[in-house]
Amino acid sequence: NRNRGHDKRDASNLGWAISELSRVAILLNENGRDGSAFEAAAKPIVDIVLNGIREDGAVGSVWDGKTGAVVTYNGDGAGFMLMGLARYHALTGDERILPVIERAFDYYYSHDIDNFRCFGGAMDCSSIDKEGIQPFFTTAKYMYEQTADDKYLEYARKAAWYFASWIYIHNPI
Protein backbone atom coordinates (compact mmCIF):
# COMPACT_ATOMS: atom_id res chain seq x y z
CA ASN A 1 0.00 0.00 0.00
CA ARG A 2 1.56 3.28 -1.11
CA ASN A 3 0.18 5.04 1.97
CA ARG A 4 1.53 2.60 4.58
CA GLY A 5 3.47 4.43 7.27
CA HIS A 6 2.21 7.82 6.11
CA ASP A 7 -0.76 9.86 7.17
CA LYS A 8 -2.17 10.00 3.65
CA ARG A 9 -5.64 9.08 2.40
CA ASP A 10 -6.30 8.00 -1.17
CA ALA A 11 -9.34 8.69 -3.35
CA SER A 12 -10.29 5.04 -3.76
CA ASN A 13 -10.53 4.38 -0.03
CA LEU A 14 -12.12 7.74 0.77
CA GLY A 15 -14.66 7.23 -2.01
CA TRP A 16 -15.48 3.73 -0.79
CA ALA A 17 -15.80 5.03 2.78
CA ILE A 18 -18.31 7.70 1.74
CA SER A 19 -20.17 5.20 -0.43
CA GLU A 20 -20.45 2.45 2.16
CA LEU A 21 -21.21 4.73 5.11
CA SER A 22 -23.99 6.28 3.01
CA ARG A 23 -25.23 2.88 1.86
CA VAL A 24 -25.49 1.60 5.45
CA ALA A 25 -27.32 4.77 6.52
CA ILE A 26 -29.78 4.38 3.63
CA LEU A 27 -30.43 0.71 4.46
CA LEU A 28 -30.93 1.45 8.15
CA ASN A 29 -33.26 4.37 7.42
CA GLU A 30 -35.28 2.29 4.93
CA ASN A 31 -35.75 -0.39 7.56
CA GLY A 32 -36.91 1.85 10.37
CA ARG A 33 -33.55 2.09 12.11
CA ASP A 34 -31.42 5.16 12.78
CA GLY A 35 -28.68 5.65 10.19
CA SER A 36 -27.67 9.10 11.38
CA ALA A 37 -24.37 7.95 12.92
CA PHE A 38 -23.22 6.63 9.54
CA GLU A 39 -24.35 9.82 7.79
CA ALA A 40 -22.47 11.85 10.41
CA ALA A 41 -19.34 9.75 9.81
CA ALA A 42 -19.51 10.38 6.04
CA LYS A 43 -20.11 14.14 6.23
CA PRO A 44 -16.61 15.31 7.27
CA ILE A 45 -15.07 13.17 4.54
CA VAL A 46 -17.46 14.67 1.98
CA ASP A 47 -16.65 18.19 3.18
CA ILE A 48 -12.90 17.59 2.80
CA VAL A 49 -13.39 16.12 -0.67
CA LEU A 50 -15.61 18.96 -1.88
CA ASN A 51 -12.99 21.47 -0.75
CA GLY A 52 -10.30 19.61 -2.70
CA ILE A 53 -11.88 19.41 -6.15
CA ARG A 54 -10.20 21.74 -8.63
CA GLU A 55 -12.17 24.22 -10.71
CA ASP A 56 -11.59 22.08 -13.83
CA GLY A 57 -13.15 19.09 -12.03
CA ALA A 58 -10.01 17.12 -11.17
CA VAL A 59 -10.43 15.15 -7.96
CA GLY A 60 -7.53 14.81 -5.58
CA SER A 61 -6.03 11.35 -5.57
CA VAL A 62 -4.20 11.62 -2.24
CA TRP A 63 -5.10 13.76 0.78
CA ASP A 64 -3.05 14.60 3.86
CA GLY A 65 -4.78 12.78 6.71
CA LYS A 66 -3.93 15.50 9.23
CA THR A 67 -4.78 18.67 7.32
CA GLY A 68 -7.27 17.43 4.71
CA ALA A 69 -5.24 19.16 1.98
CA VAL A 70 -4.84 17.51 -1.40
CA VAL A 71 -1.33 16.12 -1.85
CA THR A 72 -1.67 15.22 -5.54
CA TYR A 73 -4.16 15.28 -8.42
CA ASN A 74 -3.02 12.39 -10.58
CA GLY A 75 -6.49 10.96 -11.18
CA ASP A 76 -6.28 7.62 -9.41
CA GLY A 77 -9.57 6.52 -7.91
CA ALA A 78 -11.66 9.49 -9.02
CA GLY A 79 -14.52 7.23 -10.03
CA PHE A 80 -14.71 5.81 -6.53
CA MET A 81 -14.93 9.33 -5.17
CA LEU A 82 -17.75 10.24 -7.58
CA MET A 83 -19.64 7.06 -6.66
CA GLY A 84 -19.29 7.94 -2.98
CA LEU A 85 -20.55 11.47 -3.57
CA ALA A 86 -23.51 10.11 -5.55
CA ARG A 87 -24.46 7.75 -2.72
CA TYR A 88 -24.12 10.57 -0.21
CA HIS A 89 -26.41 12.70 -2.37
CA ALA A 90 -28.92 9.84 -2.50
CA LEU A 91 -28.86 9.79 1.30
CA THR A 92 -28.93 13.51 2.04
CA GLY A 93 -30.00 15.44 -1.06
CA ASP A 94 -27.04 17.76 -0.36
CA GLU A 95 -27.34 20.41 -3.09
CA ARG A 96 -23.57 20.91 -3.31
CA ILE A 97 -23.02 17.43 -4.70
CA LEU A 98 -24.60 17.20 -8.18
CA PRO A 99 -22.78 20.24 -9.68
CA VAL A 100 -19.47 18.88 -8.36
CA ILE A 101 -20.13 15.41 -9.77
CA GLU A 102 -21.11 16.94 -13.12
CA ARG A 103 -17.94 19.04 -13.35
CA ALA A 104 -15.69 16.18 -12.26
CA PHE A 105 -17.41 13.62 -14.49
CA ASP A 106 -17.05 15.90 -17.51
CA TYR A 107 -13.35 16.26 -16.69
CA TYR A 108 -12.67 12.53 -16.34
CA TYR A 109 -14.81 11.64 -19.32
CA SER A 110 -12.89 14.00 -21.61
CA HIS A 111 -9.44 13.21 -20.16
CA ASP A 112 -9.70 9.48 -19.55
CA ILE A 113 -12.86 7.56 -20.43
CA ASP A 114 -13.32 9.07 -23.91
CA ASN A 115 -9.65 8.27 -24.54
CA PHE A 116 -10.32 4.68 -23.49
CA ARG A 117 -8.26 4.60 -20.33
CA CYS A 118 -9.19 4.49 -16.68
CA PHE A 119 -7.08 4.58 -13.55
CA GLY A 120 -8.69 2.77 -10.73
CA GLY A 121 -8.50 0.89 -7.55
CA ALA A 122 -4.93 -0.37 -7.23
CA MET A 123 -3.42 1.25 -4.16
CA ASP A 124 0.16 0.29 -4.93
CA CYS A 125 0.53 1.94 -8.33
CA SER A 126 -0.92 4.39 -10.82
CA SER A 127 -1.89 2.13 -13.66
CA ILE A 128 -4.69 1.61 -16.10
CA ASP A 129 -7.11 -1.08 -14.93
CA LYS A 130 -10.59 -2.44 -15.48
CA GLU A 131 -11.96 -2.12 -11.93
CA GLY A 132 -11.79 1.66 -11.91
CA ILE A 133 -14.49 2.01 -14.56
CA GLN A 134 -17.30 0.43 -12.51
CA PRO A 135 -17.87 3.45 -10.25
CA PHE A 136 -18.02 5.74 -13.30
CA PHE A 137 -20.72 3.49 -14.75
CA THR A 138 -22.63 3.51 -11.45
CA THR A 139 -22.33 7.29 -11.17
CA ALA A 140 -23.42 7.82 -14.80
CA LYS A 141 -26.58 5.83 -14.09
CA TYR A 142 -27.28 7.85 -10.95
CA MET A 143 -26.66 11.17 -12.69
CA TYR A 144 -28.97 10.23 -15.56
CA GLU A 145 -31.68 9.34 -13.04
CA GLN A 146 -31.21 12.70 -11.31
CA THR A 147 -30.86 14.97 -14.36
CA ALA A 148 -32.29 13.10 -17.39
CA ASP A 149 -29.28 14.47 -19.30
CA ASP A 150 -28.49 12.12 -22.19
CA LYS A 151 -24.77 12.78 -21.89
CA TYR A 152 -24.77 10.39 -18.93
CA LEU A 153 -26.13 7.63 -21.17
CA GLU A 154 -23.15 8.25 -23.46
CA TYR A 155 -20.81 8.21 -20.46
CA ALA A 156 -22.32 4.91 -19.30
CA ARG A 157 -22.12 3.44 -22.81
CA LYS A 158 -18.45 4.38 -23.17
CA ALA A 159 -17.73 3.01 -19.68
CA ALA A 160 -19.40 -0.29 -20.63
CA TRP A 161 -17.35 -0.48 -23.84
CA TYR A 162 -14.20 0.16 -21.87
CA PHE A 163 -15.03 -2.57 -19.36
CA ALA A 164 -15.95 -5.02 -22.13
CA SER A 165 -12.58 -4.39 -23.79
CA TRP A 166 -10.94 -6.21 -20.86
CA ILE A 167 -12.87 -9.43 -21.46
CA TYR A 168 -10.73 -12.20 -22.87
CA ILE A 169 -12.58 -15.15 -24.31
CA HIS A 170 -10.56 -18.34 -24.62
CA ASN A 171 -11.79 -21.18 -26.76
CA PRO A 172 -9.41 -24.14 -26.44
CA ILE A 173 -11.12 -26.09 -29.24
Question: What are these regions, as identified by a protein language model?
Answer:
Residues 1-173:
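Glycan-recognition and catalytic cores of secretory/periplasmic carbohydrate-active enzymes
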